[in-house]
Amino acid sequence: MFIGFDYGTANCSVAIMQNGQPLLLKMENQSTLLPSMLCAPTREAVSEWLFRHHQVPATAAESQALLRRAVSFNREEDIDVTPSSVQFGLSSLGHYIDDPEEVYFVKSPKSFLGASGLKPQQVAMFEDLVCAMMLHIRNQAQTQVPEAIDQAVIGRPINFQGLGGDEANQQAQGILERAAHRAGFRDVIFQYEPVAAGLDFEATLTEEKRVLVVDIGGGTTDCSLLLMGPQWHNRRDRENSLLGHSGCRVGGNDLDIALAFKSLMPLLGMGGQTEKGIALPILPWWNAIAINDVPAQSDFYSSANGRFLNDMVRDAREADKVALLYKVWRQRLSYRVVRTAEESKIALSDRPEHAVSLPFISEDLATAISQEGLETALAQPLQRILEQVQLVLENGKEKPDVIYLTGGSARSPLIKKALAEQLPGIPIAGGDDFGSVTAGLARWAQVMFS
């Protein structure tokens, strides 16, 4: 049996085809979305959990070496890896919030798959993280259908996050493909996420149109200019319908990080001075919230940086504020800070101002973010998103009849306004912002596996 599988940066979901229509399956708490989060007692627990409780083989030499190291480490640390040791979605977030210093927590592993300079053991570790999530999701789906799920069309961005170009894309897709096979999928096909979103929109069209799909996901923005309509239904070869592609490594997570940096980090002393009037370096505050950047987070949570932050507290004119950044380091609170920014961004979709509090850092720590503050904070990443629209139009050399806007950030009035100003007079359509890619992947799976 086949599924469409959106392994997303922010959320994961799967769909089957039922009576000619995509049906998204339940993932967590009756929701069709599983937030892309995972936690375990230690990083090493994930590899042992896969092998011990789900009989997932460590196929490659590096995976086998990782498993041996993991089992040895867990034994030395007296860590008992049980079936419930690895948690996913909101459950994992709850464990992390309860005890951030003692829980290994990962948000959006997809963000790291295209990172440059990953060592073989790091690639193996990310493969295990992805495999664990895929296995959990497949098992959740399997409880809702009678046939064995062993085929999947998996969505992928035009360009994965990372600076390595084609090499980064090959690395990331390779991790996803190997993880999917280890998680029990016999046949795996990939489809571009904006094309998949367009396929779901195409089902509503009664005539051929040039459709500009703008898919703003958690980690990337992908644009495709496509010929779509009834005459293209069920055709495996759609090369002539693809007029242009473009994609960049900016998505909803980057909007959240930008908002956290501009609006929340000043509460933690960013922009301050030493007692001698020397400006404090900005980099520690950026690294603190750059949760989709492996080197930045490694640098921030290093022991050397802990000592540096301690010295900075001592020298700062507003030592009490900088001490709050030190607390973020000490208690590993980066994800909670960025999640607070994300919640503020969502709240500002339908109100002029939002009151923000960060009691997990300090009981009375609070501020207000206005629409103007949001616009200022998001100006740079939003400009990069609009550049992708311009690139795909230049690539396709045609003007769209309609814009199909989808993805988790599609609800933002700022983004709709910016697109309307960039392409005046062209209607902007929307659908299921969180499910259109998954639905389109299920439609494509039916074409490819039937």
Where is each model-derived feature located?
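Glycine-rich beta-strand-to-loop/alpha-helix junction loops that act as flexible
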Residues: R156-P157, V402-S409
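Early-domain small/polar-rich strand-loop-helix modules and first-structured segments
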Residues: M1-L118, G251-P281, W286-I289
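Phosphate-binding glycine-rich/basic clefts of nucleotide- and phosphate-handling proteins
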Residues: M37-A40, Q64-A65, M228-F360
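Extended, hydrophobic alpha-helical segments in both membrane/secreted and soluble proteins
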Residues: L176, K209-S224, L405-G408, I415, ...
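Phosphate/pyrophosphate-binding loops at sites that engage ATP/ADP/AMP, CoA/4′-phosphopantetheine
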Residues: I137-A152, I385-V402
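Phosphate/oxyanion-binding active-site loops and adjacent basic polyanion-contact surfaces
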Residues: F105, M125-M134, A168, Q191, ...
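Conserved phosphate-binding/catalytic loops in two-lobed NTP-binding clefts
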Residues: A183-Q191, K416-A442
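Nucleotide/phosphate-binding catalytic cleft detector across ATP-hydrolyzing
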Residues: M1-P22, L93-V213, P230, N234, ...
